[in-house]
Amino acid sequence: EAIKLEPDFIEAHSNLGITLQALIRLEEAIIIYKDAIIINSYYPEVHYNLGNTLKELGQLEEAGISYKHAIALKHNYYEAYSNLGITLQDLGRLEEAEINYKQALTIDPDYATAHNNLGLALQELGRLEEAETSYKHAIRLNPNSPDALMNLSIVQDYLNNLDIAIIQLKNLLIIDPDNYGLRAAVIIAIYSFLENDFSTSKKYLLQSSKIENYLTLNFKNERIYHQYLLKILDWHENKPFPLLNKISDRKLYVIGESHALVSHGLHVKFLDKSFLCKSMLIQGCMQWHLGNSIKNKFKVKFENIIKSISNQSDVLLSIGEIDCRLDNGIIKHRKKFPKKNMMHLITNTIENYLNYVYKINSYYKHKIIIQGVPSPNIETKNISKHKILELINLIRDFNIILKNKSTELGFGFLDIYKITNRGDGFSNEIWHLDNIHLSPQGMLEAWKNYSSY
């Protein structure tokens, strides 16, 4: 109504844009903000709000331009600096993001959100101690910030300070029980499982059962772990004998992403020796992360774990399945760069990963076994034949090259693909626990076929 009476009333345009944005009518909000800028391009808040709306729509480059316009008009606009930092971080421009977060904090050192966001950028850059400091600043300014508490727990995990991580997670159970607390409960369940406290693990999984109803992206990771770990625990509960009592067995450290969890607590035998598997988790770790020349959080945790175990230990590395998914890793990268050769991408990923492991292990002399990637166990109904063939060929070739390169470097190779392949590259559905992971029984079966380092 105000706009009808006075079409050049910029505050009315701005307020209408904010209202439309709150109603998730983002395209309409953008039109209104742009109309306002035509009326008066010197109104920094309109540029800022336009940037926020564009960011919500994923139009990151355009959002960045709007934030820069806002900052040019209002040099002390610390919120715009912080949001520009978020946009740059989402674009993968982490060093630029860091600069903008720090500029926001120069203007307002008590801006807790910028401390938290700076921590996220530093974490992705592999500067974990600095990230820890930033999160602690954010928590000091806002002790009940679930974002900062969760992020601090995550960085403590990558630093391998699991006891400290658990303290932050337990705080989240109290502060935000129906949101971040659900995610925290799942993570505590994982830690409890890895400490062989299966009953406590089950308790926290049951406590967080509502997470199955949370379908947003923020909960996806913990929701998958919730389902997966429940199935692992059910398998252990249904075994007729306790698997964790043979303390005389030599330890086999299983280091990796979610696929490492299923081995924990299993007794395996190879080369006439018995081993008790102890899993050590690096959530979301890909071969690409470790083979990358740039320092990152995954490398920091991997190296912390490798250093934490006795020299010349037996180690199984369970990393690589995430590199071989339809929506991630090599296929996702090739979609972005379609001219790149698939075999070159596979070989490059594997060689960089294995060379990194070989170099890091040169001092510790661990006896390394590389775990292969299972045949895919996916629903193909809504996937094109081209995509299915691409995935099948990728996983087949990935395993062949991974095995050959592992052998060249003197590593053992645990062939998961062989026992899961029904003959055409798809899973035989015998050894999978879910659509992604093998069952504990599947891992035991794989070890029956293992012959040497």
Go through each PLM region and give its residues.
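Substrate-gating cap/lid alpha-helix
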Residues: 378-416, 436, 441
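Conserved alpha-helical positions within TPR/SEL1-like repeat arrays
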Residues: 11-22, 45-56, 79-90, 113-124, ...
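Extracellular serine-dependent O-acyl
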Residues: 366-374, 396-430, 449-453
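Residue-level recognition of tetratricopeptide repeat
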Residues: 9, 43, 77, 111, ...
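Conserved SGNH/GDSL esterase-like catalytic core that processes O-acyl groups on lipids
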Residues: 252-352
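Active-site segments of SGNH/GDSL-like serine hydrolases
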Residues: 320-323, 357-392
